[in-house]
């Protein structure tokens, strides 16, 4: 179990074999759409992976892919063709993953980003709509995501171009040979620039937290005793936001405990040495045989 590095910082047990990082389901549908993702325990047992489609054998990056709820990835075209070859009266349990034989259709009560994307993709083909008891489409839409992405890009490009043209039309027309006194302009603008620059400065300089360099990248690295000692020493003597009297009382208490331990050790050693010397003294009052 680990922590995903996305802004949501969710705890997850899934691990990306290609990038070797913990990933949550939000990252699977956004940043790791074609990566091999399984549990971290599975990666510890066998870290080898194949970045090709199990159905056709070609690389996953060549075509559009889909991830099932078991996290196995296939080419959408290959998976669609395989499921279309099944009889029309196939039960929902008959549509299974070609790798692990888990059901393709996510349960109704399953709420996850991977399941939502899979439901959207399955709702665009007739064989899945037939199983889900939905009205059939006139024709399947295998290139829905590609078309939607392209149209969105064209729309954004047109919007950006129109906004740029409107901005340019609102600009003041300049003469071809205008002269600007840069010295006076800089001198007049420098107070405002200094004010804005100073406003961005933090009131209190915040230092990096202790152990900031020791993050998720090397949290599984085996540390030497020297590194452990240096880390705890920096934690003790580094400036912190806690009240100073806590640090003082901590040092005083630690010194008292150390002094008591030293006295106890010296007393124990002295008692042992004294017992040995007393045993060598000859007592004349005791009866003894001549």
Curated annotation (Swiss-Prot):
A zinc finger (RING-type) spans 53-101. GO terms for cellular component: Golgi apparatus; membrane. Keywords: Membrane, Metal-binding, Transmembrane, Transmembrane helix, Zinc, Zinc-finger. GO terms for molecular function: zinc ion binding. SUPFAM superfamilies: RING/U-box. Belongs to the ZFPL1 family. This is Zinc finger protein-like 1 homolog. It comes from Aedes aegypti. The lineage of its organism: Eukaryota, Metazoa, Ecdysozoa, Arthropoda, Hexapoda.
